[in-house]
């Protein structure tokens, strides 16, 4: 027999960003505990609103499954005499296991015969196990910022106010936070607070819906989207898909009702982002667009309640937005009273990081490093004054009133203000785009100024923080250095930038020294740690793109200082693996790698001392392969280089078939090892083949 179970944790309003991770964690923990407690069920599901986390188990068994354990005892020879009589060993083992000696069985184990005791533990009724199991579920949940309340020791996302636990119609008396679970829940805080009795687990959803709570977040999300899109259409426009905002609103309301509002069309004269940011990021409103992609003076929001009095609610939302837009219009007007360039000296008032100076000092470092990168990347010389100016103005909007009020607009407002001041289009684009990509999967800069200054900005931050010892540990990354490093890797890979990460780290480090800032850690330590840090980000990027782990490791073992080259070597080796005959070639190269590594030192190859026909032919093949492969390696065409190297397979096989590498004569041996080392050095420019899995 089986029954459904509902377990609800009622709380004060939990922040929306906590909800999805908590529900996923709750489902995973419950599934694991059900296995450990031997309680099978048909389905594990979790639901949530701002005021509750709910676990629903469909068709949960009424009893634990029987536990059967087979415990190994002494060998049969030691347990029984030749005529089958139990020895003291068998009797003692049976007694210790609590079974009769006649119940011992024989099993084969590691090639021998042993006696085993079979112990059976009857399953307990689920109702006796569930209080412990459900309490364990709650205790396993973790939140970014848990809190305590009253004199209780428990920590949770927000104070727990009630518990409901029903197994069918039977209450499970879970005790937690000074509360005991009952069959009562609470409805919408204002429309039907309750308490409300839930007769059975399966009635839970209906009882809540009757009391203005849609507990199923998936249904709530779908309903919100249908209401929003329908309302936008009736308003003569459309809303764009915004999964993040939709997700947030889903966990801000229990009984959603969408409503429309309007604002003064005069505000449409402001930059689009200035209108949208207060609307979306601060008020959680959806902007409305016309068919031509133009912003309309309308918005749609979601009310936590019924459709009663929507007109009054809409007017209230309009007043709030009008005040924010009026502030934004004022800031926009005031900020443009002085040129953006005139604001740069004020960056001296903003601390970048306590031990790394001010934002003005960072600006000067960016100018220096951006110019260095133009030269390093072999970009056109006419780009130098453009990136220098972009770097000078990139952070200037941090001192504007608009960005102070709306930090999300940094870079965006600088771009608008620079355009107002008559700066070059390339500079305006660079100011806006140097923050791109802001996160994994975000858009990339499409201007060289944005790409170069963005790369310089990230390198400066990474080098400064690593130099100051501010390295991420575990989940702690207060300066978002993982995101910064991912940005460096992504830009290098997507723009196919050819540069030495080690050298660029040195250039960034020198910027601190030149500015009078002595970093706590020496350059060589920063280089070693930061190259490894970026390598990990590259490895993660490659794994996300679906490349095999062994291919990634083989290519990164051959070097990751040139990030783009390491990426493209992985891509091309992955493609080459699919070619016919690759397995045999891999075997040949791996044999060469393994033998060459047995050498205690690097040997000088003397072609004239090659004695056997097979080794002489291998040398000639190596010279021809070098001639074919090296231009392709320099050009970054690693697939073509690999195809050229494939010509070595036959000569390598013949060499190993006919030549004794470890010859008694040390000069002959060392020369043959030198030949293999030369092959390895060529192939190692792409990958360490010995790391590939057949």
Curated annotation (Swiss-Prot):
It comes from the Bacteria. One of its GO terms (molecular function) is ATP binding. Pfam families: DALR_1, tRNA_synt_2f. It catalyses: tRNA(Gly) + glycine + ATP = glycyl-tRNA(Gly) + AMP + diphosphate. Its EC number is 6.1.1.14. It is found in: Cytoplasm. GO terms for biological process: arginyl-tRNA aminoacylation; glycyl-tRNA aminoacylation. GO terms for cellular component: cytosol. Its main location: cytoplasm. InterPro entries: DALR_anticod-bd, Gly-tRNA-synth_bsu, Gly-tRNA-synth_heterodimer. Keywords: Aminoacyl-tRNA synthetase, ATP-binding, Cytoplasm, Ligase, Nucleotide-binding, Protein biosynthesis. NCBIfam families: glyS (TIGR00211). Belongs to the class-II aminoacyl-tRNA synthetase family. Tetramer of two alpha and two beta subunits. PANTHER family: GLYCINE--TRNA LIGASE, CHLOROPLASTIC_MITOCHONDRIAL 2 (PTHR30075:SF2), GLYCYL-TRNA SYNTHETASE (PTHR30075). HAMAP family: Gly_tRNA_synth_beta (MF_00255). This is Glycine--tRNA ligase beta subunit. The lineage of its organism: Bacteria, Bacillati, Bacillota, Clostridia, Moorellales.
